[in-house]
Amino acid sequence: MSERKEGRGKGKGKKKERGSGKKPESAAGSQSPALPPRLKEMKSQESAAGSKLVLRCETSSEYSSLRFKWFKNGNELNRKNKPQNIKIQKKPGKSELRINKASLADSGEYMCKVISKLGNDSASANITIVESNEIITGMPASTEGAYVSSESPIRISVSTEGANTSSSTSTSTTGTSHLVKCAEKEKTFCVNGGECFMVKDLSNPSRYLCKCQPGFTGARCTENVPMKVQNQEKAEELYQKRVLTITGICIALLVVGIMCVVAYCKTKKQRKKLHDRLRQSLRSERNNMMNIANGPHHPNPPPENVQLVNQYVSKNVISSEHIVEREAETSFSTSHYTSTAHHSTTVTQTPSHSWSNGHTESILSESHSVIVMSSVENSRHSSPTGGPRGRLNGTGGPRECNSFLRHARETPDSYRDSPHSERYVSAMTTPARMSPVDFHTPSSPKSPPSEMSPPVSSMTVSMPSMAVSPFMEEERPLLLVTPPRLREKKFDHHPQQFSSFHHNPAHDSNSLPASPLRIVEDEEYETTQEYEPAQEPVKKLANSRRAKRTKPNGHIANRLEVDSNTSSQSSNSESETEDERVGEDTPFLGIQNPLAASLEATPAFRLADSRTNPAGRFSTQEEIQARLSSVIANQDPIAV
């Protein structure tokens, strides 16, 4: 136990010894004299404008309690009055002054001062800021000291530690220097408008600096700066303007193209519509033209089986006790056409006559010449004055014939254009084939030979023209005698009774019946709606011997002309055979001049035995006129 106490006591004694040992050392140190802090020398700097500079102020002693202060041209730089581009940083034993983006205003003398209990110390440095592109060059020796500036010199202390970011070259110098403008004589040192400066240094000879204009460089501003875009903002604006211009042009072209396409589509549609309308109008016009060319849409009867039934009934009612009228039917059928060796066949029907044999017979004869003449209508029919119309009436009197001949002579040319002329008739007829037409006359075997049945006058059929024979002995039209077999059959097949009203005793004695009437029927004659009203009133039976129509007691009685002298049966038969021979030898429309032929045939009508009419006799001149009326204008070669 006593050892531990000793040990403790020993330890305590050691600590005391240590503490007592230090105290005499500090006492000894405090007794030595203390030295004030000393600053290291700062170096002056020269730099171009816009560069970064750093000034450092350091002490050589290790004294901790030190304060640093910075001054510029004798003015303290504190937070209130220091520029924004100058910053002061404090570190242990040193202080730094940083200048960012130095400018000419930053040039001057900077001083650093250290303050402590032991003492104070200071150090200074000059900072020279030069514009860019200025190069310090040496002047010749002859010019040194020749210039004395009246301006106060500027001392520049340049430190080698400064950072120079300028493109111009610089030389570091020690000591102070002066930068003044060149005199008038030395301004020619810089060319191309450069500004001249002179740097004076006590230790070094004076030098000249040149501040060049934009676009030039070099020691004397003799070199040209390479071509480059100096202002980037202007270049960007120009580029943007160009881009906008090109974009606007492209958009305008696109809009124009779209408008062109739309306009083309619209015009194409309109053109298509117009073409469709034109096509429809052309189709309608073609249809109308075809309808006009084809005529009205009414069914036409087929030409293979044409049946024409003409029924004519007298409007004046006659008692059945006196007159029995029968309707005449004329039937044409193409299935029963008969072909002959000649060009045409004309069917001629004659009413029942008795040639001194006391019997009424129906004669069916065929001649080999077609002379179709329905009626002759004067051109004055269409005039406003309503001129008379001449027509050939089978039952008319001499007055009608004379008036007809008069008007026919007055207008020979206008007749050719009449719808009743041979041109129209021959154009619608084909006289190559004819079908026989049976004409049944209601007659009785007991009737006198001079009597004629009334239906002959009541029938109105297209009236053919008659050919005039140049022979003296021919006084009747060209006929073919019906065979006896056919005569007997017809005589037996049509027995009829006549009323006493039709019996004329004045014609019983010494009179021959009139020449047989003939009816020329064309097999292909078409009665259209246009010509039916004009042809119906003029379709009358005609013969070389005229019959006169009389109206006794309101009834129609047709009496034929008969000859006053009766001829023998042999002479009549001879004349019929001669007529048959002449009819066979007569060509179709052989007479070219009807007027000359009728004049040549004039003696043929001057016979001793003249045929008389109960109402009056025809003179020879009237018979000639009747012949002329039957053949007028039917020999037109153009119509044939």
From Swiss-Prot:
UniProt disease annotation: A chromosomal aberration involving NRG1 produces gamma-heregulin. Translocation t(8;11) with TENM4. The translocation fuses the 5'-end of TENM4 to NRG1 (isoform 8). The product of this translocation was first thought to be an alternatively spliced isoform. Gamma-heregulin is a soluble activating ligand for the ERBB2-ERBB3 receptor complex and acts as an autocrine growth factor in a specific breast cancer cell line (MDA-MB-175). Not detected in breast carcinoma samples, including ductal, lobular, medullary, and mucinous histological types, neither in other breast cancer cell lines.
Know the name of this protein? Pro-neuregulin-1, membrane-bound isoform
Q: Which residues lie on this side of the membrane: Cytoplasmic?
A: 266-640
Q: Record's superkingdom?
A: Eukaryota
Any one GO cellular component localisation term in the record: nucleoplasm
Q: Which Pfam families match?
A: EGF, I-set, Neuregulin
Q: Where are the transmembrane segments?
A: 243-265
Classification lineage? Eukaryota, Metazoa, Chordata, Craniata, Vertebrata
CDD domains recorded: EGF_CA, Ig_Pro_neuregulin-1
